[in-house]
């Protein structure tokens, strides 16, 4: 983990590997190491630049409500600072929304975009869910994580975690980032519908069939609305990035190779 001072803000990021650069955005409550398992399973070397949202990792805590476009501008400025003119972009959950918006705003710089459990517009059920997350985290991050694991993994995935479940809960709860409430407030406001028609980079949309938070129909909508998009459905819940990292790496590797 390292950081960069930009416009009086500290921007945290991780830098791993060598090769063509990939700008990777994490999901709500997370930090830039969210893509570690996918990176480790990747079929070929890449340079992974993990961007920390405000309030995550080494990034400064937000002083106002988060603005998606400002996050995108900061991330692209970071890539320029690191010497990258063009790059692949990938994102998970809120990070997928950010990656898609990045591809729409900077079509000349984004080589490909990968959306993992992304969506265009937060619907009523999602807004209620995100509000519940805010309340649970405020009460007890461990209570939130017990709910998240129960709802975010498949039964098969929870079977695999069973021998170490309490340890996983404790570790995961300790990783809930200080800026999570701001992330969730942004989640509730998401609407990038108008951006979908502006994305010209090859786009891989990965949806999780058992996702209870971002319904698989959200992935279907992205894939049908974005020119040059392909769809992959994986048999997992929203926490697919932990449960099926190898499958994500394989699909994304094929996408980047093409």
Task: Tell where the protein language model's regions lie, with residue ranges.
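Conserved HGGG/HGGXW glycine-rich cap/lid loop of the alpha/beta-hydrolase fold
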Residues: 9-61
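Active-site loop/oxyanion-hole signature of alpha/beta-hydrolase fold enzymes
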Residues: 40, 49-90
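Gly/Ala-rich beta-loop-alpha elbow adjacent to hydrolase catalytic centers
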Residues: 91-95, 99
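Flexible "cap/lid" loop of the alpha/beta hydrolase fold
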Residues: 100, 104-105, 110-140
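Conserved alpha/beta-hydrolase catalytic His-Asp/Glu region
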Residues: 124-126, 142-195
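Short beta-strand/loop motif that positions the catalytic acidic residue
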Residues: 199, 205-207, 211
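Conserved alpha/beta-hydrolase "acid-adjacent" motif
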Residues: 212-218
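Catalytic histidine-centered segment of alpha/beta-hydrolase-like enzymes
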Residues: 236-249
